[in-house]
Amino acid sequence: MNIPDNLRYTKDHEWIKLLEDGLTALVGITDFAQSELGDIVFVETKPVGTKVAAHGTFGTVEAVKTVADLFAPAAGEIVEVNAGLDDAAIVNSDPYNEGWIVKMKLDNPADVEALLSPADYSALIGE
């Protein structure tokens, strides 16, 4: 299972990457999540400009066998939705790069540090 060292993780299997400006972050689902979901056919998010609470839902991922809610790792505003998600399978093939789901402007970027480290997430999923 791929668990990049430069990200933080949630118990709900989302990842977050704080960007260079220190205020915005990319959010997506983990390699573990995409493999558990199976073939992803559609991703729906709340629109740009939506404020989302930490652990609040910001969208859904629809796979062949199930639909799963997406939970925000930290509070903030959705400032961009990945246009590449028109081909939702990108979340399966490249969940940490081209398959990111939303970009958020975080209310408190320091909250990211309180999330699971790569080692903690690895332990959570039994890797």
Swiss-Prot record:
Keywords: Lipoyl
Entry GO CC: cytoplasm; glycine cleavage complex
One of the protein's GO biological processes: glycine decarboxylation via glycine cleavage system
Cofactor note as given: Binds 1 lipoyl cofactor covalently.
Cofactors required: (R)-lipoate
Family: Belongs to the GcvH family.
The protein's name: Glycine cleavage system H protein
Organism field: Chlorobaculum tepidum (strain ATCC 49652 / DSM 12025 / NBRC 103806 / TLS)
